[in-house]
């Protein structure tokens, strides 16, 4: 905990310095799946530095106390991206994989500690059987394919969502990834698959109601803090910065409890066209906001 306090001390800058010019870059989208480059192993107990962006741009300098600690992202626009190019919708999802890994690298470079991404909502079951089957299998394969790369960079991986209807094979891959990365502390990434904000709140309410019926808790003593303990992951901090791509401007049932006081940044790029520089731009816009939390 002391390390985290020092990292975010006022006046300090948590950004990684510019990478050497010959340091590996990512992503090269000429092939799919996009190949993750071989990066030098970390030294002195440290994790490996992420590959730099292909542009070789470095993260902007933002004081530690102004960097959003928790960033949530609605990765929107995959289907439209594919349709605009005369491709099937699944091709857009495929291209989005590299973007997810790229913004993870960018989040590490700028000093973000928690990243939560919306990969499959409880409403997505309404899509065609073909697309749902693809998305479930795709999430499973992405976790299996990328967990070693993310582990090398000190990423802690976790699944957030509801178990009903969730494919057991997807849960299995997330369980393996979570066990592999449980001690990593560079950044925590929460992958929301079969997630819905209202469902999360209802499930928490059911648990509390049952505790009240069992006499374990008095209804009139239930607090926000007690309620939060029954969310899918009670240790997820409140969202500081909420990003949605593709130009749409709505929350779409994502992190309704955790994002109560988040700053929203809506960006026009479709998700497959997005990269870490867009994430950094959103962080710079966040710095300009005046967060009052109900105060005058």
Swiss-Prot record:
GO terms for cellular component: cytosol; plasma membrane. The keyword Metal-binding applies. PROSITE patterns: UPP_SYNTHASE. Residues 1-29 are annotated as: Disordered. One of its GO terms (biological process) is polyprenol biosynthetic process. Disulfide bonds: none annotated. Residues 1-11 have a biased composition (Basic residues). InterPro entries: UPP_synth-like, UPP_synth-like_CS, UPP_synth-like_sf. It holds the Pfam family Prenyltransf. Substrate binds at residues 77-81, 89, 93, 121-123, 125, 127, 244, 250-252. The active site is at residues 76, 124. Its cofactor is Mg(2+). It is an enzyme of class 2 (transferase). GO terms for molecular function: ditrans,polycis-undecaprenyl-diphosphate synthase [(2E,6E)-farnesyl-diphosphate specific] activity; magnesium ion binding; manganese ion binding; Z-farnesyl diphosphate synthase activity. Binds 2 magnesium ions per subunit. The keyword Metal-binding applies. Its EC number is 2.5.1.-. Mg(2+) binds at residues 76, 263. Belongs to the UPP synthase family. This is Isoprenyl transferase. The gene is uppS.
